[in-house]
């Protein structure tokens, strides 16, 4: 394990252990003999998440059920990263089971849900004090991860969970990455579009500083109810983030100078000039953050609104997770994560070795050995399989950009519109349906739209295309001009 500072280790591990663990005998039993599933918490990018009770101890847990034929090697990577993390600011991993065609991942249960759930339940963004308290815990979690040379790569309000003690924890390591000594920076496009750092989008290589940019966007999301650019199509946002100045508050004067400065420190275009998580923990805005009691009061307010029927969420008990209609709790599914995966082939022997080290019980399902449903996703090869020159694993690691089943771009998270904070973003829903239609060729839904609306959308589409062309031309000239200048200089010298 890479070394980390003593202070960060103390900050991350103080009060961490909850005393619960799964022993080898429990891992060797069928999961239904060990747990009672008591309710569904939500749907995520890899599968569904459920609330469960450990039969022997009564301990409340969260279980993520993942179809094995989706992306097994990526799930193994997620488990590996979770298992290595021992911080009270990172969701704890206890063990996993194979059950039929699913992998059950047993994790710490966070009874108050995500920050996104809280905002939806209260139908309003967070206050400045609430935001600073959430950011303090999140920064401690990021400091811990970054000390271990790990990048989360998907920081957003939907991936910050709260327990009922008012402690914020980082969750969803499905796209997290490890920085090794031989790979100082990654260059894969991965994350959620609106929260992506410019260097991630441009694929020029990135490191832990990418998480800091995403944290700054998340701070704006918590303050305004939605991230910057969420009112436009994600593809346009991906184009604009690297070319436009760093985003700021819509009304900076409504927030303290300390908060404005914190956002500025996070959202610096050049990653080398961005502060680290450790340095941001020393920022005045974070140092003056209130205690957990502020977040406990926020959670209580959200739960009261649920119980009074003032929020579009379901509640299953005093410590129930806040559930939004059509939205996930453990993993926010409303704003899909953009991922490019390698087509890794894994032998059953290597997978079994990983399973043993990661506390995974049960037998590898047959579906893990590849099927027509894999559609190019990483899969496991049966025992005895050896790589050959014709193996796809020997081909270039990524498909052409924007192609393949793992290229996912979703619409923005349910937005808060006007004073009423409408929970349905009709523009986003239209764009979502339109993008699906582009893929499957079924544009039948357009028949239900009025002529005036169709004309309006066509005119809007034309203007958007013209603006994107102008942006592309400006970007092209910016790249082309230095080359022309150097050519001219060389001609003069000759």
Swiss-Prot record:
Catalytic residue positions: 154
Annotated keywords: ATP-binding, Kinase, Nucleotide-binding, Serine/threonine-protein kinase, Transferase
Record-level Gene Ontology MF annotations: ATP binding; protein serine kinase activity; protein serine/threonine kinase activity
One Pfam family recorded for the sequence: Mst1_SARAH
CDD domains, alphabetized: SARAH_MST_Hpo, STKc_MST1_2
Keyword Iron listed: no
One GO process term, biological-process aspect: determination of adult lifespan
Record flagged with keyword Translocase: no
Enzyme's top EC category: transferase
EC number: 2.7.11.1
CC cofactor: Mg(2+)
Stretches for region Disordered: 1-27, 364-413
Protein kinase domain location: 35-286
Cellular component, GO annotation: cytoplasm
Binding of ATP, residues: 41-49, 64
Catalytic activity: L-seryl-[protein] + ATP = O-phospho-L-seryl-[protein] + ADP + H(+); L-threonyl-[protein] + ATP = O-phospho-L-threonyl-[protein] + ADP + H(+)
Post-translational modification note: Proteolytically cleaved by caspase-3 during apoptosis which results in kinase activation.
Site (Cleavage): 332-333
Record's function text: Serine/threonine-protein kinase which extends lifespan and delays tissue aging, probably by activating daf-16.
Family indicated by similarity: Belongs to the protein kinase superfamily. STE Ser/Thr protein kinase family. STE20 subfamily.
The protein's name in its UniProt record: Serine/threonine-protein kinase cst-1
Species, as recorded: Caenorhabditis briggsae
